Amino acid sequence: ILSPGISLNKNKNLQKYKKKIITDLDLFYLDRKKFKSIVVTGTNGKSTTCKLLDHVLKKNKFKCLMGGNIGKPLLSLNKVNNSFVIIEASSFQLSHSKFIHPNYAILLNITNDHLDWHVNMKNYINSKFKIFENQDKNQFAIVNRNFKYLFKRKKLTGKLKVPNLKQYVKLKPKLKNNYLKLNMNDENLSFVYELTKLLKIRK
C-alpha cells in the first residue's frame, strides 16, 4: 500500500512495481459490504462540501460516515450495509488508485496546484479523473460546468451531471446561515444541491 505522500512520477525505483501498488482507497473499496460512496475531489472546497453533505444526509436520517482527508482515516471507518460514506480524496490518493468506483463522484474544480508532486498539469488532471474511471452506468459523475469539454476526450461510463449554478442562486435567499450565503460558497453548495436532487432530498 503506497503512502499518498510518495509520487511514482519522482521515484524511479518504485515505478517497476506500479502494477502491484495499491492505495488505502483501493483497500477500502475491496471491502464487500454494500455501502454507497460519495467521493469529492477538486483543488478547492473539498472539506466544505464534504461537511455540508454530511450535515444534509444526517439531517435527513441517512446512515452516514465521513473520512479520507477529513474526519477519520478511511480504513478505520466501520462501514455498515446501506450506509453512505463521504470521502474527501486528494490528487495524491487518487493518482495511483485502481479500484475506486464511487456511486457519486464529484469534481469541484481544478486549478494549478501540487505540480511539484505531479510534475505537470496533465498528470494532475488525470489523477482527479481517476474517480470516474471505474464507474458503471448506474453511477453518477457530477462535474464543474467548466470541465464538460474534457469528457469529449475521455471515456465516461457514469451518468454526467452538471450543477446548475443559476438554479441554486435562486434558492440562496432561503439560507439562514450568513456564512453560507457568501458568494465564495456558491459553487460548493450548487454541488450539494445537485446531489440532493439525485437522492430525492427535499429539506
Which residue ranges define each predicted feature?
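Phosphate-binding loop of NTP-binding sites
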Residues: 4-141, 145, 149-156
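Adenine nucleotide phosphate-binding catalytic loops in nucleotide-utilizing enzymes
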Residues: 118-125, 129, 155-203
